[in-house]
From Swiss-Prot:
Substrate binds at residues 38, 60-62, 92-101, 218, 236. Pathway: Pyrimidine metabolism; UMP biosynthesis via de novo pathway; UMP from orotate: step 2/2. This is Orotidine 5'-phosphate decarboxylase. SMART domains: OMPdecase. NCBIfam families: pyrF. The gene is URA3. The active site is at 94 (proton donor). GO terms for biological process: 'de novo' pyrimidine nucleobase biosynthetic process; 'de novo' UMP biosynthetic process. It comes from Candida parapsilosis (Yeast). Coiled coil: none annotated. It catalyses: orotidine 5'-phosphate + H(+) = UMP + CO2. Keywords: Decarboxylase, Lyase, Pyrimidine biosynthesis. Its EC number is 4.1.1.23.
Amino acid sequence: MVTNKSYRERSDTSSSPVTRRLFHLMEQKQSNLCASVDVRTTKELLSLVDKLGPYICLVKTHIDIIDDFSYEETILPLLELSKKHKFMIFEDRKFADIGNTVKHQYTGGVYKIAKWADLTNAHGVTGEGVVKGLKEGAQETTDEARGLLMLAELSSKGSLAYGEYSKKTIDIAKTDKDFVMGFIAQNYMGGTDEGFDWVIMTPGVGLDDKGDNLGQQYRTVDEVISKGTDVIIVGRGLFGKGRDPVVEGKRYKEAGWNAYLKRVAAGR
């Protein structure tokens, strides 16, 4: 059953330090909006994030598409913006290998994701070792709390992530209550009867477009929030097709928060 508890109530009882921090921040900013900023240059990334920062609780990156990436010029300014605007950082890496490999992918290489991303995500296809590997990597890299989202369902047409696959992914999530904070999913994932209170983040949310020619399918803000989504992930709806990110940031922030208030009120 979809929870009607407020983010503040849930932050008080969560075993995940990242969830607690995120829910507290969401209440403080009155925002459940995550900006997906898929651009190709550091300048574009930082400019967009600075404009959207006041309206979001999270920024979602695909850091490996930045053509001119460097830790000093890309990540350090991004971290400064996260402090300035009070948002968290989610690197959408979608890890999908054995535990030892993902540990090195998470901590090493050019990107050193574990050093700067508050949360990341992983597929369940390789089993629970992916969770163990990423958790070890986080613990060995930083004293800062880190969180993991499992990819239970996707928003793209023809996705294989549903049914039995989703159920198995939920089983993997249950192996670590502190590090695994929730799911990328299209619906409520259950677990409350076993003491889990997972954060559900949903991509493919739009107020205008219904999809694109590459298989993306959009659902409305009210629809996803009513079905259990806690954080709406919006990308091109904020800045694509010449849209003004400030105008759209305000618009999506308001729509997401109002939908959340409706859900909470329904349970009172």
